[in-house]
Amino acid sequence: MSVQSSSGSLEGPPSWSRLSTSPTPGSAAAARSLLNHTPPSGRPREGAMDELHSLDPRRQELLEARFTGVATGSTGSTGSCSVGAKASTNNESSNHSFGSLGSLSDKESETPEKKQSESSRGRKRKAESQNESSQGKSIGGRGHKISDYFEYQGGNGSSPVRGIPPAIRSPQNSHSHSTPSSSVRPNSPSPTALAFGDHPVVQPKQLSFKITQTDLTMLKLAALESTKNQDLEKKEGRIDDLLRANCDLRRQIDDQQKLLEKYKERLNKCISMSKKLLIEKSTQEKLSSREKSMQDRLRLGHFTTVRHGASFTEQWTDGFAFQNLVKQQEWVNQQREDIERQRKLLGKRKPPTANNSQAPATNSEAKQRKTKAVNGAENDPFVRPNLPQLLTLAEYHEQEEIFKLRLGHLKKEEAEIQAELERLERVRNLHIRELKRINNEDNSQFKDHPTLNERYLLLHLLGRGGFSEVYKAFDLYEQRYAAVKIHQLNKSWRDEKKENYHKHACREYRIHKELDHPRIVKLYDYFSLDTDTFCTVLEYCEGNDLDFYLKQHKLMSEKEARSIVMQIVNALRYLNEIKPPIIHYDLKPGNILLVDGTACGEIKITDFGLSKIMDDDSYGVDGMDLTSQGAGTYWYLPPECFVVGKEPPKISNKVDVWSVGVIFFQCLYGRKPFGHNQSQQDILQENTILKATEVQFPVKPVVSSEAKAFIRRCLAYRKEDRFDVHQLANDPYLLPHMRRSNSSGNLHMSGLTATPTPPSSSIITY
């Protein structure tokens, strides 16, 4: 077992005479360092100064004399004062009383340096003992030891040198060992510091000891060292492998980064080329559309500005195509009048039949005789026109057949002219729409193909509303066409009105963004251009809306209309199955897009600006409050939306069911069921919808009774009697491959006739 300390070896008692009476340069230097040492703070401790001044003057004198003797001995002189003699006389007793704090250098393992120091110290101790024996009588006569005059905190009667830290006393402190019993109080002042108050005080360091016991042998240590070396080699090898792998990965990253930069550059070139080609194509389309519009201005007509008093209005003037059709129609009418006149003349030349041949002659003769009697003369001076020569019966029938054929031909020509006129009217509607679009596009600030949000390249204007413009755009990131709706606020609006409009648009964006259904137009993105302009990016559809189709074709077949209604109801069912449910509230033909532009294709619902969210807070048993009364399209809203009272009316998804019925009626008959030729203001003033208690069906075109019954269920006046969206989705009329065969309730499914169902069946019969 080995005990180590930082202060040196402490196996034996220290030799006080080595410090006090043996004049060595090391001891003198140690004394000077002790006297001149200052604590880390840089000034002597106040407690040591107070204790020094509180000493007896005699004790202070003895202490000074003792350390003066040490300094004198270190210079090598042989003379000493009486105080130094006294100190050397008490050398042995001081050494024995020092205890475990002495130096253990006498007990250390023999080394060349230590042997020399011990031999020199031994010779000095012998000389010192001779001096002590020669002066023993004078010192021993006093009867007191110098340690009796000191009270040191480390123990009564101990030598002042014992308070000196071992690191100062022992010159071999860095190579010595100590026992576990050696300890130094860190805060105990030393007598040296007390004796010299004007010098800095040494701050002793706190010592720590560690006792270690082991049974390791050299073989085990060698094995451990070998194992550690092997582990170290493995770790170094692993580190080298990882460094090489890291270098490889860094090289791969650099290669991939270069490749990525190359692809990015190539992608940017492709995007730039795509933009260039799209702009060229759009420019050519704009030029061709304007050329075609100029040609159609002469053929179909154009707008002219007409002054009425102090104001100017635009008036439509038909082109030569309509003028030619009008002339042809006038010629047909004139030909018809001529044929009718000739038919009347032919009737006068109709030959008499055999039974009636005498009667007309007798009558004529009687008239002639009467005329002569009145005139009084038989010779008439006036030339009378000859009576038309009567035709034979064959000639009469021949002429009559010719006139009938001519009338039939004129009727056919008139029908063709009417059909051509209707076709030209449809083309004229497109032409008028294109003229307005071109005019709006020329006045738009986005006409020069800008790229919005560094992503959407605007191509051409699709349409314009009250406060918004819709452009066909190309998404450069997703490489697809899109419809960008640009909302522009009026700069003269108050900030409150702008905030309300923006809040309304953000609400529409939040509602529409969460919807994902094949029958609903998708909303891709939303961003702002400035404080007064923001955009929404929607799915682009090639075709027109249902309203434009109805204006072009007036109506459609029942199969086509039923297909459109089925898709609308499917989308409404989705809106009512999500949480929270949504009421569209603005269903109309203008908000139903025909993907292919025909009635036999897919449809998509758009425009959720007036939608209502049926959350738990606002929706109750009777529905939710209508907070935006007066908004919407009046022809397609139910009667409960027009009720005025102290409290707002309650609405539910049955509002959309009413709209479906109106749209279905308009598709079948080409007109609206209520307020067809009225404006919204007239509908509101005359309470047209509030009076719409029952729907009336025209005689033509012919529509099935099942379709009429379906419309009645949708247009029930009381909302309690009206179907909701879920009931409407399960209506037998909309179920696929099912038709009503007769009024008894038979159903045909895929060509098979089903048996009549009892009244208690789940299938509703009408």
Curated annotation (Swiss-Prot):
Entry binding sites for ATP: L462, G463, R464, G465, G466, F467, S468, E469, V470, K485
Enzyme nomenclature, EC number: 2.7.11.1
Tissue expression pattern: Ubiquitously expressed in all tissues examined.
Keyword Repressor: no
Positions carrying Phosphothreonine: T38
Recorded GO MF terms: ATP binding; protein serine kinase activity; protein serine/threonine kinase activity
Cofactor(s) demanded: Mg(2+)
Bias kind Low complexity: ranges: 20-33, 68-85, 170-192
Active site, renumbered: D586 (proton acceptor)
UniProt similarity note: Belongs to the protein kinase superfamily. Ser/Thr protein kinase family.
Assembly notes: Heterodimer with TLK2.
Protein's name according to its UniProt entry: Serine/threonine-protein kinase tousled-like 1
Organism: Mus musculus
Organism classification: Eukaryota, Metazoa, Chordata, Craniata, Vertebrata
